[in-house]
């Protein structure tokens, strides 16, 4: 199957690959983005109220969760609604 691999944000630049040949996928399956480099944590964003994704470090056959997926509560933890609203 030939497909564009896109992210969850409604922006024209939110894509990981265009016209990429992929195996047949079913709804709910995941795609791993390997060799993403060291920019995941430093360049991640909460833009559009999106919690930060989990990160997994992979080396050879070993892997480790290095950052848990952020929850909605994590996302709004530092916010406060003023009393006058």
List the predicted regions and their residue ranges.
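Charged (often Lys/Glu-rich) extended helix/loop segments that serve as interaction or gating elements
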Residues: 1-85
């Amino acid at each position: 199957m030939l497909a564009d691999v896109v992210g969850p944000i409604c922006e024209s630049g939110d894509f990981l690959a265009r016209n990429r040949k992929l195996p047949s996928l079913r709804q709910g399956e995941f795609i791993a983005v390997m060799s993403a480099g060291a920019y995941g944590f430093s360049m991640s964003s909460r833009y559009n109220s999106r919690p930060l994704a989990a990160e997994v470090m992979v080396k050879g056959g070993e892997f480790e969760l290095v950052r848990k997926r952020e929850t909605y509560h994590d996302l709004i933890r530092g916010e406060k609604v003023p009393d006058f609203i």
